[in-house]
């Protein structure tokens, strides 16, 4: 198969040309897994056999549901034991954070994301949401102690640099995050 040969040749060339680890980004992996799981897994095995030290599973269209993502990752880990996985999700379905957290629960060791979720179409997973969830709710250490509060300022700097008003309701870092005002919610 030409595609498998191209994957193998590209990875082998990069491994031979550099002393650095080679990561394989499996673009459209979850779409491919949905339509042909065997072939999707074969592409990953091919990359690993050629020397890729890590495989990044990509939800390129941002359309996978968390339960589908979890199932696919479990199948990958079952079929290719010992594989080191990363995750790269888009937020087209509003599930970027949920899918990334699910991937971590399934053993993924690397996250691709951006500050404020900035990216093509509906964006990538927002690291200003992922990092606090990992630190505060799941017990991971992502940033040096005492630096978590700096995410709010970082978020604002990025929005300012882009000349965009950030959403007031942005989780963890938006001005309305954790603010309670009068009304039905407070009186309930």
Language-model segments: residues:
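Alpha/beta enzyme core
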Residues: 1-85, 101-108
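Beta-strand segments within the central parallel beta-sheet cores of soluble alpha/beta enzyme folds
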Residues: 25, 57-59, 86-90, 113-114, ...
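Glycine-rich phosphate-binding active-site loops on the catalytic face of alpha/beta enzymes
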Residues: 57, 105-125
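Short glycine/serine/threonine-rich phosphate/pyrophosphate-binding segments
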Residues: 93-98
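C-terminal helical cap(s) of enzyme catalytic domains, especially alpha/beta-barrels
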Residues: 119-148
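A mid-to-C-terminal "edge-of-domain" accessory segment
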Residues: 138-188
């Amino acid at each position: 198969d030409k595609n498998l040969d191209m994957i193998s040749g590209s990875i082998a060339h990069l491994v031979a040309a550099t002393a650095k680890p080679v990561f394989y980004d499996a673009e459209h992996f979850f779409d491919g897994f949905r339509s042909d799981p065997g072939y999707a897994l074969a592409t990953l095995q091919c990359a690993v056999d050629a020397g890729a030290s890590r495989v990044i599973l990509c939800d390129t269209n941002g359309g996978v549901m968390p339960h589908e993502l979890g199932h696919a990752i479990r199948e990958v880990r079952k079929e290719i034991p010992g594989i080191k996985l990363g995750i790269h999700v888009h937020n087209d379905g509003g599930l970027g954070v949920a899918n990334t957290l699910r991937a971590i629960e399934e053993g993924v060791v690397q996250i691709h994301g951006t500050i404020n979720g900035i990216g093509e179409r509906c964006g990538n997973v927002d690291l200003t949401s992922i990092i606090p969830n990992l630190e505060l709710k799941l017990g991971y250490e992502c940033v040096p102690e005492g630096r978590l509060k700096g995410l709010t300022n970082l978020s604002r700097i990025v929005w300012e640099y882009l000349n965009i008003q950030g959403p007031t309701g942005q989780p963890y870092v938006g001005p309305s995050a954790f603010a309670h005002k009068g009304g039905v919610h407070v009186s309930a």
